[in-house]
């Protein structure tokens, strides 16, 4: 009999498989699609154009995982984005921000000398606060109802870092626990800087910058430290699927078996214990532990409510899986131009990182959210444009480019019929917004792939199209994720575990959920839980 069956071949499940197999456990990964990675994939949608179709940047990837699994020697190459963001401005120089502090301050100073003076202190608070949280990312969450000695080490490291905050602690708490608007406006006065920073608070969240709790989402996305530089995110050479392939290589080398085109349709239960899975082709497999890399709602559906403890099932059903996200993938025949680069023949600094378009003020970001909340499509959505082939030319034919548009806010409860009428129409609106600051952009598009929330759910198996496997609100973090009492990757059904982004520490391509879950599962199977 197998020791472990992992449902889904997403990056967290692949990470868990590698650790479990390295521990000597007989492990198999079952992925329903023909390629591995879940939402962390590269797809050649059009000849010569390699697209990171869902997840599109790295930066939260845990350094311990990279080192322990030897991902760099397995071909993983992270390409830091320097600068990291560009906000075009038709009436000004635009705003380039990145790890070069002097260059960033010079850009900010165009809009506000006061903001340029305060920005280094803001960065310092973010860095110090991140040092408090980081030890907690790499360990199962502390459960106050059932404390363990093993919880003490990460808590003590976090406490030591917290003491280091000293006079910054009030500012850090205000940023992390409040709304993005309250946090950002207490620091800065210039609208380009305010709105640029606020977008990180909204990624994947059905919220506007004024929504309480968005400060944590902002902070979550600022914890990236590619190459040891805080806030620096990276592209993966070859697309995001190259990361998943490196993880799969580590798992296979350790002895794990990985199958694609192997869709799990049911989790089997015998004598009150999860012990098997059934595949779409009728194959049945048994194991001592069934580990789901799917989101909690999808896991419950595979289990069947009749086999789930009632309180746990009710908690999972109450989770918020709404998604305001549309993903548009493009093939371009040439580089886009912007006010700062009216003649873009070669990639410049403006093309390296995230380009902020569409809603350009805090008020417009709130208006975009309000439209989606009413079930409508916003006139000026939030648009984040990235051009990974400007940094990684292996992704497109010579002289051509791939682009990714991460778009919010779309109505999260809109049905398939709504999207049949509005999917392409809204994509046209998005391109028209880009044309305002990048003349002729829409005319450069050779191909496009438009994914509304129902499409993201259908293709990638994410309930509601939610990229985080459930909202990252303050009441769904740490010992409360996915639900109170069941945050340490186990479920109340013996033999069934979770390892996806619906568990601590949450969404983003970091691999921590899989790594942490593997530690818990190994101990459980060896009788050391």
Question: What residue ranges belong to the model's regions?
Answer:
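Structural core of flavin- and non-heme-iron oxidoreductases
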Residues: 1-35, 39-40, 108, 114, ...
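Extreme N-terminal leader/targeting segments of oxidoreductases
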Residues: 1-4, 22-23, 477-479, 483-484, ...
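Conserved FAD/dinucleotide-binding core of flavoprotein oxidoreductases
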Residues: 110, 241, 297-303, 331-333, ...
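Active-site/ligand-binding neighborhood in enzyme catalytic cores
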Residues: 127-254, 462-477
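A glycine-rich dinucleotide-binding beta-alpha-beta segment and adjacent secondary-structure elements
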Residues: 190, 194-210, 375-388, 440-504
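Mid-domain catalytic core of redox enzymes
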Residues: 235-237, 256, 263-396
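A conserved FAD-binding loop/helix module that cradles the flavin
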Residues: 501-522
């Amino acid at each position: 009999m197998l020791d472990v069956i992992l449902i889904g071949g997403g990056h967290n499940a692949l990470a868990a498989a590698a650790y479990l197999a390295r521990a000597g456990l007989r492990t198999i990964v079952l992925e329903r699609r023909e390629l591995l990675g879940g939402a962390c994939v590269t797809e050649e949608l059009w000849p010569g154009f390699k697209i990171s179709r869902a997840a599109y940047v790295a930066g939260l990837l845990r350094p311990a995982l990279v080192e322990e699994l030897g991902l760099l020697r397995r071909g993983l190459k992270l390409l830091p984005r320097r600068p990291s963001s560009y906000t075009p401005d038709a009436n000004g120089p635009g705003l380039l921000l990145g790890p070069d502090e002097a260059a960033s301050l010079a850009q900010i100073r165009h809009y506000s000398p006061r903001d340029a003076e305060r920005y280094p202190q803001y960065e310092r608070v973010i860095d110090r606060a991140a040092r408090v949280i980081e030890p907690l990312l790499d360990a199962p969450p502390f459960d106050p109802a059932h404390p363990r000695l093993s919880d003490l080490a990460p808590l003590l490291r976090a406490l030591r870092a917290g003491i280091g905050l000293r006079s910054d602690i009030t500012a850090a708490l205000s940023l992390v626990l409040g709304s993005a608007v309250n946090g950002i406006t207490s620091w800065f006065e210039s609208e380009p800087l305010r709105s640029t920073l606020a977008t990180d608070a909204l990624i994947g969240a059905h919220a506007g910058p004024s929504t309480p709790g968005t400060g944590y989402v902002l902070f979550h996305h600022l914890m990236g430290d590619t190459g040891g530089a805080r806030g620096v995110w990276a592209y993966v050479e070859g697309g995001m699927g190259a990361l998943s392939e490196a993880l799969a290589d580590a798992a296979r080398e350790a002895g794990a078996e990985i199958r694609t085109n192997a869709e799990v349709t049911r989790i089997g239960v015998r004598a009150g214990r999860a012990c098997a899975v059934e595949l779409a082709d009728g194959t049945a497999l048994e194991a001592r532990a069934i580990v789901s890399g799917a989101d909690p709602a999808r896991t419950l559906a595979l289990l069947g409510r009749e086999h789930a403890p009632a309180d746990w099932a009710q908690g999972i059903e109450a989770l918020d899986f709404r998604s305001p996200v549309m993903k548009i993938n493009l093939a371009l025949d040439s580089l886009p131009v912007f006010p700062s680069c009216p003649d873009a023949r070669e990639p410049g600094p403006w093309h390296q990182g995230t380009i902020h378009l569409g809603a350009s003020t805090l008020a417009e970001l709130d208006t975009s959210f309000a439209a989606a909340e009413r079930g409508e499509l916003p006139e000026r959505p939030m648009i984040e444009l990235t051009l990974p082939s400007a940094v990684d030319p292996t992704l497109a034919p010579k002289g051509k480019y791939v682009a990714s548009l991460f778009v919010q806010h779309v109505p999260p409860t809109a049905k398939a019929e709504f999207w049949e009428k509005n999917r392409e129409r809204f994509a046209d609106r998005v391109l028209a917004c880009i044309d305002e600051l990048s003349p002729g952009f829409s005319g450069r598009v050779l191909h496009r792939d438009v994914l509304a929330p129902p499409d993201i759910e259908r293709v990638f198996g994410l309930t509601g199209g939610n990229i985080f496997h459930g909202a990252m609100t303050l009441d769904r973090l740490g010992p409360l994720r996915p639900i109170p009492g069941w945050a340490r990757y186990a479920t109340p059904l013996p033999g069934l575990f979770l390892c996806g982004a619906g568990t601590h520490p949450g969404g983003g391509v970091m691999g921590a959920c899989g790594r942490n879950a593997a530690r818990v599962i190994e101990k459980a199977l060896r009788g050391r839980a």
